[in-house]
Amino acid sequence: MTHVPVLYTQAMEGLRVVENGTYLDGTFGRGGHARGVLQQLGPGGRLLVMDKDPEAIAMAERVFSCDPRVVIRHGSFALLAQLAAPQSLDGVLFDLGVSSPQLDVPERGFSFAKDGPLDMRMDPEMGESAAQWLARVSEREIAEVLWTYGEEKQSRRIARAIVAYRANQPLLRTVQLAELIASVMLRTKSGACKSRIHPATRSFQGIRIHVNRELVDLEVGLEAALAALRPGGRLVVISFHSLEDRIVKQFISRHAKVPPTNRRLPEVQTFVPLLRMIGRAIKADEDELEVNPRARSAVLRVAEKLDVLEAVR
């Protein structure tokens, strides 16, 4: 069965693919969006494909290496400037967060529900694994990451437990960490966990985001995408939690809306909008949620790059 990504139809509508255009899929994953773009491109069109995950790139090469319209590059979309010249793209798509294959394969170490090595790296050849990071850093740094990137209210309690645990034995497995977190979480008088989600959900999110520099890459990637889009080009971003969506929303607003001014201070320069918001944020409907429950937290935002000369007239 062909994988259909979250908010697929809305993403394709947002990109507004033209037959001879040039597009960038910055998060190839299983290739669902890439296939959708290629179905609409003619012989003169072009699709640039990127992904941090070498397994995703291997799939892209298996499926699309014989298609002359496709250029495949292993790496984060934060590096898209190395692949696309300024004002050369008609559309850019980022489908953020962890992919289904990464969650579903225990050996990748992303899931607290399946036992595997405590890795969490989207590119296993880059940087520290989650286990290496947890073994090295201070209690304070662990707590800060869980709080900042996982929005975990019990971050200090969990960090304290991790440091105490690692003093006696290493944390090397996903289920090992998940069970440790669950064992120290505050509970109600009846013994139930206070949260409706799994106790390790936010901690795993925070560690994963930190290990992969996800929010740093997102901020850099958005700026690079803006530079690479030609006037009229579309930016389409699908995010899966509030931290990602906040960055995307603020980025679009910063380049689309006149910033507030202080009437007591002189205006430094005239604001020139570079983006136009296209519609409101889009979420999955009930029909899609029945087929794909993981779509519940997805938010899609679309913006169009403006012609600077037109904008200042």
From Swiss-Prot:
Q: Which residues bind S-adenosyl-L-methionine?
A: G31, G32, H33, D51, F77, D95, Q102
**In this record, what's one Pfam family?**
Methyltransf_5
**What does the entry give for GO biological process?**
rRNA base methylation
UniProt keyword Methyltransferase present: yes
What is the top EC class of this enzyme, as a single word? transferase
Q: Which InterPro entries does the UniProt entry name for this protein?
A: RsmH, SAM-dep_MeTrfase_MraW_recog, SAM-dependent_MTases_sf
Q: Which GO terms describe its molecular function?
A: rRNA (cytosine-N4-)-methyltransferase activity
Subcellular location(s): the record lists:
Cytoplasm
A cellular-component GO term for this protein: cytoplasm
Keywords in alphabetical order: Cytoplasm, Methyltransferase, rRNA processing, S-adenosyl-L-methionine, Transferase
Q: Reaction(s) catalyzed by this protein? A: cytidine(1402) in 16S rRNA + S-adenosyl-L-methionine = N(4)-methylcytidine(1402) in 16S rRNA + S-adenosyl-L-homocysteine + H(+)
Q: What are its E.C. numbers?
A: 2.1.1.199
Instruction: State the source organism's domain of life.
Output: Bacteria
Keyword Transferase listed: yes
**Predominant subcellular localization, coarse grouping:** cytoplasm
**Family note:** Belongs to the methyltransferase superfamily. RsmH family.
Q: What does this protein do?
A: Specifically methylates the N4 position of cytidine in position 1402 (C1402) of 16S rRNA.
| Cited NCBIfam families | 16S rRNA (cytosine(1402)-N(4))-methyltransferase RsmH (TIGR00006)
The protein depicted here goes by the name Ribosomal RNA small subunit methyltransferase H
Q: Which gene encodes it?
A: rsmH
